[in-house]
């Protein structure tokens, strides 16, 4: 019999949901997925990082849905009032084909290429969710959740909960450090942050090479 503390070693299928449903107020209201970095939309960089790691990709979006649909199936929040990332996670858990669902933001062009392999290594039979840590801070919108959490999340939203970390703390959570990849979860929440990050890229870094 497997102990609840022993890591899982099986290669199970994973769905991924790119969270693109926010208002992006610090980006001047622009749809962040379509803001360009090195000549390509941020969403393209994110999808490049995700495709080799997962078995299904969905995009959670509340606007530009037809445009996103050209890249992957689109799901909107159940509530139209922009309730935050937890609402996107609820929609993703409900729509995903597989039991484990990876969530990432649409403005994460440097997501780790070994994100899922490290998350898998952290799982035990008791684990309900896995969250990334950058060495200084928890990164709650980069997380692997089991679909069995959907009823709990639906209740939390109905009760007015909007804070991811508070809801996460109610469940069996594993935390995985990516301190060795300092840019993995770079914040690109404003035009200034985007420009500063792009300025650090090599002069030749365009297209897919920008996040290689």
Where are these regions (language model features)?
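Intrinsic disorder/low-complexity segments
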Residues: 1-8
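Nucleotide and nucleotide-moiety/phosphate-recognizing core
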Residues: 8-161, 166-185, 191-205
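Long, low-complexity, intrinsically disordered segments
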Residues: 205-212
């Amino acid at each position: 019999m497997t102990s609840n503390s022993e890591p899982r070693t099986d290669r199970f299928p994973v769905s991924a949901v790119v969270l693109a449903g926010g208002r992006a107020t610090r980006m001047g209201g622009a749809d962040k997925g379509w803001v360009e970095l090195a000549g390509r939309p941020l969403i393209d960089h994110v999808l490049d990082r995700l495709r080799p790691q997962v078995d299904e990709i969905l995009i959670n979006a509340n606007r530009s849905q037809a445009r996103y649909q050209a890249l992957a199936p689109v799901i909107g929040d159940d509530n139209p009032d922009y309730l935050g990332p937890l609402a996107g996670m609820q929609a993703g858990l409900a729509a995903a084909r597989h039991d484990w669902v990876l969530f990432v933001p649409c403005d994460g062009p440097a997501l780790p290429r070994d994100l899922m392999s490290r998350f898998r290594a952290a799982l035990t039979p008791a684990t309900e969710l896995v969250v990334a840590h950058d060495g200084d801070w928890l990164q709650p919108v980069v997380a692997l959740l089991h679909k069995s959490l959907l009823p709990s999340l639906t209740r939390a939203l109905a009760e007015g909960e909007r804070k991811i970390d508070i809801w996460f703390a109610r469940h069996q959570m594993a935390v995985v450090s990516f301190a060795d990849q300092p840019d993995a979860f770079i914040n690109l929440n404003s035009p200034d942050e985007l420009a500063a990050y792009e300025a650090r890229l090599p002069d030749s870094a365009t297209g897919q090479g920008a996040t290689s």
